[in-house]
Amino acid sequence: KFATKAPETRQKLWDKLNITPRAIDREVTESMHRTGMGTDQDYKNLIMQACRTSMADGWGGAMIATELQDILFGTPKPTRGTANLGVIKEDEVNIIVHGHEPQMSEMVAIAASDPELIKEAEAVGAKGIALAGICCTANEMLLRHGIPLAGHMKMQEMAIATGAVEAIVVDIQCVMQGDEEVARAFHTKMITTSPKAKIDGTMHIEINDENAYDKARDIVRIAIKNFPERDKKKVFIPKGKKSDVVVGFTHETIKYMLGGKYRASYRPLNDNIMNGRIRG
């Protein structure tokens, strides 16, 4: 139970309000039932169930997903990176990854750094392969690998509209319906990778546990072959629109910064909040 990691006073408050989640799927399923036709019609009761569901999401699903991602792909550490549309390269094959499932983006990142594929990119006139992220996947790639962040969710169409993106690769959630139409106005290939989230008019290459790396290589090759199709007259990459950032301050990193390898602790921070030197 991840909720038991919260401070005791907070847990007591949750129990008093009766909003401690009983299980992740139970709260979601019950919310769906309550909001069905002619069921729960008391707004106060619905709000309390919404609180339980949000707790199940945050202290259940999100924390489990975070732990599993750190186990599979490594815990992030402070890393320098860059952000904004200026990270898109005018003279390289540009691939944008966008979504929420780390499996796809991690494999595309590995494939994009393959010397064999970089040579293929150079053979079509590019200086290399540039990978950038949009939305939540972008944050994961930035934290773990320093791969640039092209923008947040509302900037996905703008990234395509630079005219310099050979492929935008997506999986689930936050993918705007207009992306495919914008991509058609340029040379950009839009590629979906999840069987749960296909988009009409796009190319679909399913990525799963067995074929992830091989399919990622196929995707990178599609982007490389698309590089000569770029219309230079349509290319507009905002100059100077790029910021340097330092990211990756995880729970483990902060404890280490406060106490070193052998005395990692939040005590210095807690003490200074209590004595008033730090407002928290």
Question: What is the role of each PLM region?
Answer:
Residues 1-280:
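Metallocofactor- and cofactor-centric catalytic cores in central/energy metabolism, strongly enriched
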